[in-house]
């Protein structure tokens, strides 16, 4: 009888897929606690690098207070305009159609206050907020906040437990530190662009990434630093600390074997476009037919592309069977032979000729039947509409208090007990002045009104 009961219980156990779905369903996140609830973060940031760092902490439940310039807000609000100009009722800097979409990706879940860092009244506000905060995140030029009297050395005297994270392009010390930086500068000096794009003999040149990878990667690394510093404070030292993140340093950290290759052999890693210098076949080919020939979007009318990964000798043999070219399979049966530059040119040319009368979906179907790894190159529309990513919450519809219905990226990871979550996308400049400055800085309604009239907040 006991065996029958145990067997029935085992039979009712969910599959691993069912268990994961039940455990990580993003729609249930708001019924669970937050990992960083009670942690207060002061975000004195602009553009993407600093704001994304603070926002990653906000996804985990930290109370992130974003400080912007009065009236105008920070610069990213003025890129890629959207349609709510009412966010700028008192400013002559009103964007033509409102807040930029570029602002959304790096600032969800934050509280928004305005404060002029240059003025004594604004600096006094920062000090009051820092005294009651766990973390300050800042990405102005190195030493700027120190000159204003609100840098780490000044604020740590007010709050010895404060974790202060400075992020910037070239670091706070060294001969190149004084330059300003953006993502594109960081990737360029860090060596990333030098390895991206087609080589000259293919008609190519170094290529930049459309997505600001160095900024978002850097923001994540900054968040890791902060979490480590908080752990050290709470479990070991009892004191805060000062952390620095260099955008260029972070890019260099991602260069794989490029630096060891140069250091040991004096060889500069080359650009190799959509192919791979180490593996073949392991790259992107062009398919000759569009998947959406009737689309009104010009980019969708273009030919499609697909990634094919068949560098294993057995996989390559099957790929040649699909293509119908036994001679190439025999000639390049071993990986050492096909990974050579001239061999790759010949092989990829063969593949593109084979795909010239096919869409990327047709190519994928043929490769799937042969059990060959592949993935059509998707655009943002295809990602947004795919049921897998919708079900997992990678793409979410958000009923935002400012935008209304808004499609937005969800958090990139999942946690069973304390899941990250998306609460709101943004708010107007200074939307939380009364709540935050009244509660934490102790300012009365009369003081808030006076500071607003003086354009200090």
Residue ranges of model-derived segments:
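Terminal low-complexity tails and localization/encapsulation signals of metabolic enzymes
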Residues: 1-40, 269, 275-280, 286-291, ...
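N-terminal helix-loop segment corresponding to the beta1-alpha1 unit
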Residues: 2-236, 428, 434-457
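Nucleotide donor/acceptor-binding cores
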Residues: 39, 241, 304
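Glycine-rich beta-alpha junction loops
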Residues: 71, 170-171, 247-252, 289-291, ...
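Short, surface-exposed loop/helix-turn segments at secondary-structure junctions
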Residues: 77-85, 179, 261-270, 386-401
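Conserved Rossmann-fold dehydrogenase catalytic segment
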Residues: 172, 202-212, 234-251, 271-275, ...
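Oxidoreductase and adenylate-handling cofactor-binding alpha/beta cores
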Residues: 200, 219-241, 254-264, 320-327
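Aromatic-enriched alpha-helical interface/lid elements that frame and gate functional surfaces
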Residues: 281-370, 374, 387
């Amino acid at each position: 009888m006991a065996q029958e009961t145990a067997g029935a219980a085992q039979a009712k156990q969910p599959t691993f897929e069912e268990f994961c779905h039940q455990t990580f369903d993003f729609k249930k996140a708001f019924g669970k606690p937050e990992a960083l609830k009670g942690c207060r973060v002061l975000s004195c940031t602009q553009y993407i690098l600093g704001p994304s760092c603070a926002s990653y902490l906000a996804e985990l439940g930290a109370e992130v207070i974003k400080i912007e310039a009065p009236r105008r807000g920070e610069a990213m609000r003025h890129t890629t305009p959207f349609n709510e100009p009412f966010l700028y009722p008192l400013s002559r800097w009103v964007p033509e159609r409102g807040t930029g979409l570029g602002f959304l990706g790096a600032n969800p879940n934050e509280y928004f206050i305005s404060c002029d860092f240059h003025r004594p009244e604004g600096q006094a506000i920062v000090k009051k907020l820092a005294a009651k905060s766990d973390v300050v995140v800042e990405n102005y030029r190195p030493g700027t906040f120190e000159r204003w009297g609100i840098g780490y050395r000044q604020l740590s005297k007010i709050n010895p437990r404060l974790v202060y994270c400075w992020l910037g392009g070239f670091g706070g010390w060294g001969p190149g530190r004084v330059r300003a930086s953006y993502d594109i500068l960081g990737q360029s000096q860090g060596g990333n662009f030098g390895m991206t794009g087609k080589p000259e003999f293919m008609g190519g040149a170094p290529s930049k990434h459309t997505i600001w990878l160095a900024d978002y990667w850097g923001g994540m690394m900054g968040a890791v630093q902060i979490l480590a510093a908080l752990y050290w404070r709470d479990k070991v030292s009892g004191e805060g600390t000062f952390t620095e993140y260099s955008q260029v340093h972070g890019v260099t950290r991602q260069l794989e074997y490029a630096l060891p290759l140069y250091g040991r052999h004096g060889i500069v890693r080359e650009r190799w476009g959509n192919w791979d210098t180490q593996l073949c076949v392991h790259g992107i080919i062009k398919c000759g037919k569009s998947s959406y020939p009737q689309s009104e979007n010009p980019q969708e009318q273009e030919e499609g592309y697909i990634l094919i990964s068949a560098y294993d000798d057995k996989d390559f043999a099957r790929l040649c069977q699909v293509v119908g070219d036994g001679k190439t399979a025999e000639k390049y049966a071993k990986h050492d032979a096909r990974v050579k530059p001239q061999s790759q040119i010949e092989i990829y040319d063969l593949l593109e000729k084979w795909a010239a009368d096919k869409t990327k979906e047709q190519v994928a179907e043929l490769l799937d039947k042969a059990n060959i790894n592949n993935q059509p190159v998707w655009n943002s529309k295809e990602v947004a509409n795919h049921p897998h990513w919708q079900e997992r919450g990678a793409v979410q519809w958000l009923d935002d208090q400012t935008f209304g219905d808004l499609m937005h990226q969800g958090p990139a990871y999942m946690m069973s007990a304390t899941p990250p979550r998306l609460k709101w996308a943004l708010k107007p400049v200074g939307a939380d002045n009364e709540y935050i400055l009244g509660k934490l800085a102790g300012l009365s309604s009369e003081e808030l009104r006076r500071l607003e009239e003086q354009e200090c907040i």
